[in-house]
């Protein structure tokens, strides 16, 4: 089998996890200097520029990422059907340049900066910042503990043996 056919089989039969890893796109020069990486996985909210294809030169934010299609929908990039309906055009991530990142995901930023995200301090929720006044808990006297069972339950085997003894 030709190598091209083998490669295409690997791509189209890949698991979603592998396809997700294939959704990387090049970073702009300033982001490359900042993070020391050439490419990053595209997420919703990233700003991108289209480098190749019909929509070359268009800037926009990523509206949707489709791992099944291995491509991305961008705000403002739409086509019109003959009836007048508009639909998103999905563009492969290899044809994009990431100009700014969505920084809401702290885990992602920590990974880009080369820090271990598991060792990052977790931010406390806003509700937990104001501790409520807690009343000291009153110790309630415990009820008398029940004594341990003195006689264990009879098992079926014991019952049968007793019945046989009674019959004899």
From Swiss-Prot:
Positions of region (Disordered): 112-168
MF GO annotations: RNA binding; rRNA binding; structural constituent of ribosome
Domain of life: Archaea
Gene Ontology CC annotation, any one: cytosolic large ribosomal subunit
Cystine connections: none
CDD domains: KOW_RPL26
SUPFAM superfamilies with a match to the protein in the record: Translation proteins SH3-like domain
PROSITE patterns in alphabetical order: RIBOSOMAL_L24
GO BP field: cytoplasmic translation; ribosomal large subunit biogenesis
Keyword Ribosomal protein: yes
Similarity remark: Belongs to the universal ribosomal protein uL24 family.
NCBIfam families: rplX_A_E (TIGR01080)
Subunit composition and interactions: Part of the 50S ribosomal subunit.
Its job: One of two assembly initiator proteins, it binds directly to the 5'-end of the 23S rRNA, where it nucleates assembly of the 50S subunit. Located at the polypeptide exit tunnel on the outside of the subunit.
Entry-linked PANTHER family: 60S RIBOSOMAL PROTEIN L26 FAMILY MEMBER
Protein's recorded name: Large ribosomal subunit protein uL24
Taxonomic source organism: Nitrosopumilus maritimus (strain SCM1)
């Amino acid at each position: 089998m030709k190598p091209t056919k083998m490669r295409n089989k690997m791509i189209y039969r890949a698991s979603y996890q592998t396809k997700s890893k294939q959704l990387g796109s090049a970073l702009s020069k300033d982001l490359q200097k900042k993070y020391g990486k050439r490419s990053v996985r595209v997420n919703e909210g990233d700003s991108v520029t289209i480098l190749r294809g019909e929509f070359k030169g268009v800037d926009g934010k990523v509206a949707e990422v489709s791992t099944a299609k291995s491509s991305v929908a961008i705000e403002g990039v739409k086509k019109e059907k003959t009836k007048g309906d508009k639909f998103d055009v999905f563009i492969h991530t290899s044809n994009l340049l990431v100009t700014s990142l969505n920084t809401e995901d702290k885990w992602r930023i920590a990974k880009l900066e080369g820090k271990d995200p598991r060792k990052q301090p977790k931010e406390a929720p806003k509700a937990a910042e104001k501790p409520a006044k807690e009343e000291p808990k009153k110790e309630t006297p415990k009820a008398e503990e029940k004594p341990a069972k003195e006689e264990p339950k009879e098992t079926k085997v014991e019952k049968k043996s007793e019945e046989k003894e009674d019959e004899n």
